[in-house]
Regions:
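Small/aliphatic-rich secondary-structure junction motif
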Residues: 1-55
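Active-site phosphate/pyrophosphate- and oxyanion-stabilizing loops and adjacent acidic/basic residues
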Residues: 17, 74, 95, 128
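Short secondary-structure boundary segments
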Residues: 31-32, 106, 110-112, 143
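A short acidic, glycine-rich active-site loop
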Residues: 51-71, 116, 120
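Glycine-rich, Arg-bearing micro-motifs that act as flexible, cationic patches
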Residues: 109-133
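Short, flexible loop segments at boundaries between secondary-structure elements
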Residues: 131-144
Length: 144
């Protein structure tokens, strides 16, 4: 079975370090880019009639997000140091993570809220959704 490692911008190092313990499993490094920011830029540009489509800032943001995801996944794979696959998705982050982990044997993610105290506030909204809706076991890592 596959172990899915959520490679989020601020917490990916801790998740990748935790994933090394599952070296015998097939590892999938997952990054999700939120579709809201490029979508808002596309929408704002669409409201400006007469603008040439090549100047749409949403397209540039899409490209920047794809480049960022690629670089982050490459850094995560290098840090992991074992064979793995990578996946870059775009959409509602929490929904994409849950969908990617649907057939997984384990999902590894990291607390991303107020980690000065234990409890529900130590999870950000997307992470809380994933913990509540994942259909596989979840390894919740404390950030260092």
């Amino acid at each position: 079975m596959t172990v899915v490692v959520w490679v989020a911008d601020d917490t990916w190092q801790d998740c990748v370090d935790a994933a090394r313990a599952f070296g015998g499993e097939e590892l999938l490094l997952l990054h999700v880019s939120d579709h809201d920011v490029p979508g808002a830029a596309h929408g704002a540009f669409a409201g400006l009639f007469g603008r040439h489509p090549s100047r749409d800032p949403g397209a540039r943001l899409d490209g920047l997000a794809a480049d960022h995801a690629s670089r982050l996944l490459e850094a995560a794979a290098d840090r992991l140091g074992v064979p793995c696959t990578t996946s870059a998705r775009v959409g509602r982050v929490e929904h994409e993570v849950v969908a990617a982990a649907r057939e997984a044997s384990l999902l590894i993610l990291c607390r991303d809220g107020d980690v000065s105290h234990a409890g529900p506030r130590s999870l950000g909204p997307a992470t809380r959704f994933v913990v509540d809706h994942a259909t596989c076991p979840v390894l919740l890592v404390w950030p260092t």
